[in-house]
């Protein structure tokens, strides 16, 4: 399985890639919405994993852009923003699920597996 992970925090990007690669998945990690759209346009992914805030801006425009580019691939927001409005907005933009940081590696793997394996 191939995952596009969009996260502006380098430590979080590295840790998440380590966890997901340990689960046997291929991870392409980028640090901006622009890089995410370019990467998604040039390759197929099984899941998009998005932080809610990238460089001081929300990723809702990215979520909508990914949804237009690829209407079927699941989108999972993985963010420290835990207000109900954050979750509602992400889902309204086309995401299938929202997971709040921090969580255990097992919870992240389980959330991804649920979206990609049924």
Stretch-by-stretch model annotation:
Residues 61, 82-97:
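Alpha4 helix (beta4-alpha4-beta5 surface) of REC/receiver domains from two-component response regulators
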Residues 7:
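Conserved acidic carboxylate
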Residues 103-113:
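C-terminal output helix
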Residues 10-28:
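Two-component/phosphorelay signaling modules centered on CheY-like receiver
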Residues 29-47, 88:
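Acidic, metal-coordinating helix/loop segments flanking the phosphotransfer/catalytic sites
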Residues 60-71:
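Short amphipathic alpha-helix used as the core "switch/output" element in two-component signaling
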């Amino acid at each position: 399985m191939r995952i596009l992970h969009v996260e502006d925090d380098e430590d979080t990007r590295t840790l998440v890639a380590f966890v997901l690669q340990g689960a046997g998945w291929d991870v392409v990690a980028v640090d901006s919405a622009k890089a995410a759209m370019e990467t998604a346009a040039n390759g197929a992914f099984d899941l998009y994993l998005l932080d809610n805030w990238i460089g001081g801006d929300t990723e809702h425009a990215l979520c909508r852009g990914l949804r237009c580019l690829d209407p079927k691939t699941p989108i999972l927001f993985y963010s420290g923003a835990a207000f109900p409005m954050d979750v509602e907005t992400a889902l309204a933009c086309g995401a299938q699920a929202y997971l709040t940081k921090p969580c255990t590696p097992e919870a992240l793997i389980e959330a991804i597996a649920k979206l990609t394996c049924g």
